[in-house]
């Protein structure tokens, strides 16, 4: 007979520890770092797409040229149909952006590249994004995450009950706040990759939670002689091996990406690994105890 662990009794302690870590992380972020490290995707910037008539130039070569000149710089390779050319998107972050600054940056970049590679340089596209537009992108990203929460609430309410939906949402809120605190404490640059990581974590954590909730729902119908507390603990025990195995295999796969990559992909994999750990324990120790408290109160 499978051993049944009383997971619910640990719920309050786990929630308190998580809440303290999140609170300390947020305080540290705003009072020590002065806020978050917003990446170029969400900052005022100059963007220049260009082509160099020379093959096999690497991103790091471009970064080494301009890192002493520009404090915040991002370089990405663009696929070129011409194998004799190398194409790049170069973004320079600045607090003050206008047409004159864009012209100055473009001239500096072209001059330096011609001097370094002794090749023809063609500007494919160039533009600047001011602070008002970058602020709009931040707000839209926040609304994107909130919209995801609303869709999750509707989906789980239709599939299960409102109590299940609220427990899932609160559990995911915990996961996101934990990740947000983690990003702030370690000064990880928040860019489009990190937003994708957060949305992926939401989906992963939700999947873990739904697996447990689905078993709880089935056992409520089947184990009619048991209290809901017993049903909850039995259900978590029955799905625990699957939950842990899925988390471990996912973590190992993402860890390999973290080891063998650099830049934004490395940050993405780091955040996702933290999300896997947090999402796993929150689905067991936070979502289920919350459901226990809500089950009799909300149908």
From Swiss-Prot:
Membrane-spanning intervals of the chain: 14-34, 142-162, 166-186, 193-213, 245-265, 270-290
Statement: the UniProt record of this protein carries the keyword Nucleus: no
Signal peptide, first to last residue: none
GO molecular function annotation: protein-transporting ATPase activity
Subcellular localization: Cell inner membrane
GO cellular component: plasma membrane
Annotated membrane topology: Multi-pass membrane protein
Gene3D superfamilies listed in its UniProt record: Multidrug efflux transporter AcrB transmembrane domain
GO BP term, pick one: protein targeting
Major localisation: membrane
InterPro entries in the cross-refs: SecD/SecF_arch_bac, SecD/SecF_bac, SecD_SecF_C, SecD_SecF_C_bact, SecF_bac
Keywords of this entry: Cell inner membrane, Cell membrane, Membrane, Protein transport, Translocation, Transmembrane, Transmembrane helix, Transport
One Pfam family in the UniProt entry: SecD_SecF_C
Family: Belongs to the SecD/SecF family. SecF subfamily.
Function, in words: Part of the Sec protein translocase complex. Interacts with the SecYEG preprotein conducting channel. SecDF uses the proton motive force (PMF) to complete protein translocation after the ATP-dependent function of SecA.
Subunit structure as annotated in this protein's UniProt entry: Forms a complex with SecD. Part of the essential Sec protein translocation apparatus which comprises SecA, SecYEG and auxiliary proteins SecDF. Other proteins may also be involved.
Record's protein name: Protein translocase subunit SecF
Upper taxonomic lineage: Bacteria, Pseudomonadati, Spirochaetota, Spirochaetia, Spirochaetales
Gene: secF
């Amino acid at each position: 007979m499978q051993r049944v662990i009383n997971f619910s009794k640990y719920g309050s302690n786990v929630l308190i520890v998580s809440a303290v870590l999140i609170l300390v992380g947020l305080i540290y972020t705003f009072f020590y770092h002065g806020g978050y490290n917003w990446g170029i995707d969400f900052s005022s910037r100059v963007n220049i797409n260009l082509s160099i008539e020379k093959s096999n130039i690497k991103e790091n070569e471009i970064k080494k040229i301009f890192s002493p000149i520009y404090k915040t710089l991002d370089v990405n390779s663009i696929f070129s149909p011409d194998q004799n050319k190398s194409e790049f998107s170069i973004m320079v972050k600045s607090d003050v952006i206008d047409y004159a600054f864009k012209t100055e940056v473009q001239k500096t970049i072209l001059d330096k590249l011609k001097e370094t590679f002794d090749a023809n340089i063609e500007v494919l596209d160039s533009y600047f994004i001011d602070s008002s537009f970058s602020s709009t992108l931040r707000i839209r990203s926040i609304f994107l995450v909130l919209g995801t929460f609303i869709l999750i609430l509707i989906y789980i309410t239709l599939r299960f009950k409102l109590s299940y939906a609220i427990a899932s949402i609160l559990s995911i809120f915990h996961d996101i706040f934990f990740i947000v605190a983690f990003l702030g404490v370690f000064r990880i640059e928040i860019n489009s990759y990190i937003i994708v990581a957060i949305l992926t974590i939401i989906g992963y954590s939700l999947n873990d939670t739904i697996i447990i909730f689905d078993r709880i729902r089935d056992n409520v119908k089947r184990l009619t002689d048991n209290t809901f507390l017993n049903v909850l603990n039995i259900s978590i025990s029955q799905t625990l091996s699957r939950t842990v195995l899925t988390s471990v295999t996912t973590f190992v796969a993402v860890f390999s990406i973290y080891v063998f990559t650099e830049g934004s992909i490395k940050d993405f994999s780091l955040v996702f690994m933290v999300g896997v750990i947090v999402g796993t324990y929150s689905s067991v120790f936070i979502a289920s105890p919350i459901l226990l408290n809500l089950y009799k109160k909300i149908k």
